[in-house]
A protein has these predicted regions:
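Short acidic/histidine- and often glycine-rich active-site loop of Leloir-type glycosyltransferases
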Residues: 277, 332-342, 346-347
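Nucleotide-activated donor-binding/catalytic signature segment of Leloir-type glycosyltransferases, i.e.
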Residues: 273-293
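Conserved donor-binding/catalytic core segment of Leloir-type glycosyltransferases
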Residues: 186, 230-248, 254-257
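Short hydrophobic beta-strand element within catalytic cores of glycosyltransferases
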Residues: 327-330
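Acidic anion/phosphate-binding donor-loop and adjacent secondary structure
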Residues: 194-197, 213-228, 277
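Conserved acidic donor-binding segment of nucleotide-sugar-dependent glycosyltransferases
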Residues: 342-353, 361-366
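Aromatic "clamp/platform" in nucleotide-sugar-dependent glycosyltransferases that forms part
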Residues: 310
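Short alpha-helical donor nucleotide-sugar binding micro-motif in glycosyltransferases
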Residues: 297-302
């Protein structure tokens, strides 16, 4: 079988790593595979890649969205060229992942998908496919996606725009994304499956396929990090994010650090250098790790992993930490709860005071 994966990145970021992993698994089974990507590719040695457009195409698409609010409808020439490559490759299965990110024209793409006769799988990693613009909405309490969007409360959030075209975009996406023959959906959590079942995508076959991690990477891993950062006698509370946007809970970590005794140390990974200087001194703020092996070392070192995110469609870092032997603490009513419960974690009520209570209970049990 010939597979074509389409994602904003290849081997980079959370979705890019998942696509790379899925591609390698099928190549190991003897299938022919390619990854088409828009913005970044790394760690894809041995995988044939199809770049969609150029960095300049992405920048122009992003600028168009900032001004007009029509993200997903730029990159016409780049997408037209890409679709000619798709026809030449002639895949048996087209596997869509994240289509937002200013790299592909969804009008041209779904015009092709509607008539190509191929088997199509679409793995949803967020809610963008059934909204007028945003990938997440529950943390701001928005239900406009149920009735067609418009009057958007998140124009200043990714994907940021000056013009509210969400009602128009919603209608265009609904027309494009529905009624595609041979298309099935996959989601990583019951939480996201429930939302999809209430959206205009509800008529497609839907499978629950939880994300997985590489056990060769994420397992208990010894290191000298404790000595390097003087954490030998501390109860380490770890948080990790690729981008510390508001929904990830950075403010809750700041409040949490003030509630913990000196015997605890909060360590946050993924903090930009400019932001590191602004955080309280009792937080050890570090940039992104050099590689996944170093990240596994941090997970292993930690006494507890905390994810105060208020909206996730899965929670990869929660799973990674658990696979390294560290107890996760998450907020209730997000997909992270599903991951934590499956690995003996704690699901706390929302608020730093509840996180502190759970952490101090674990510290007491550990006698540390």
């Amino acid at each position: 079988m010939k597979y074509l994966f389409i994602n904003v990145t290849a081997g980079a970021g959370s979705t890019g790593k998942l696509v790379e992993k899925a591609c390698r698994e099928r190549m190991a089974q003897g299938h022919e595979c390619r990854i088409a990507y828009g913005r970044e590719a790394k760690n894809c040695q041995g995988i044939p890649l199809l770049p969609i457009g150029t960095p300049g195409d992405c920048r122009r698409h992003a600028l168009m969205h900032r001004i007009h609010g029509t993200g997903g409808f730029g990159s016409k020439a780049a997408t037209a060229r890409f679709l000619e490559q798709v026809k030449a490759y002639d895949p048996d299965i087209i596997w869509l992942h994240n289509l937002h990110g200013y790299y592909i024209n969804i009008g041209l793409l779904f015009g092709y998908l509607r008539t190509c006769g191929k088997k199509i799988i679409w793995t949803l990693h967020d809610c963008w496919a059934f909204t007028g613009n945003c990938p997440y909405f529950t943390y701001v309490g928005c239900d406009r996606w149920r009735t067609g969007c418009g009057d958007c409360p998140q124009l200043d959030k990714y994907p940021q725009t000056r013009r509210d075209a969400t009602k128009e975009n919603f209608a265009r996406k609904k027309e494009l994304f529905t009624g595609i023959p041979n298309l099935s959906l996959q989601v990583p959590s019951k939480w996201l499956a429930d939302l999809v079942s209430q959206s205009f995508l509800k008529d497609y076959p839907l499978s629950l396929v939880p994300n997985t991690v590489d056990p060769a990477v994420f397992h208990p891993t010894k290191s000298d990090l404790a000595a390097q950062y003087h954490l030998e006698h501390k109860f380490v509370v770890l948080g990790v994010a690729n981008i510390w946007e508001p929904r990830k809970g950075l403010q809750d970590f700041i409040s949490l650090s003030a509630r913990l005794p000196d015997s605890c140390r909060v360590v946050l990974i993924g903090i930009p250098r400019k932001l590191q200087k602004k955080l309280p001194k009792n937080i050890l703020a570090l940039p992104r790790t050099k590689n996944q092996q170093e990240l596994a070392q941090w997970y292993t070192l930690a006494d507890v992993y905390v994810s105060p995110s208020v909206e996730e469609t899965f929670g990869m870092t929660v799973l990674e930490a658990a696979c390294c032997g560290t107890t996760p603490i998450v907020y209730q009513n997000t997909a992270c709860q599903e991951v934590a419960q499956a690995h003996g974690g704690i699901c706390a009520a929302r608020g730093p005071e509840h996180l502190a209570e759970a952490i101090l209970s674990l510290q007491k049990e550990a006698g540390k």
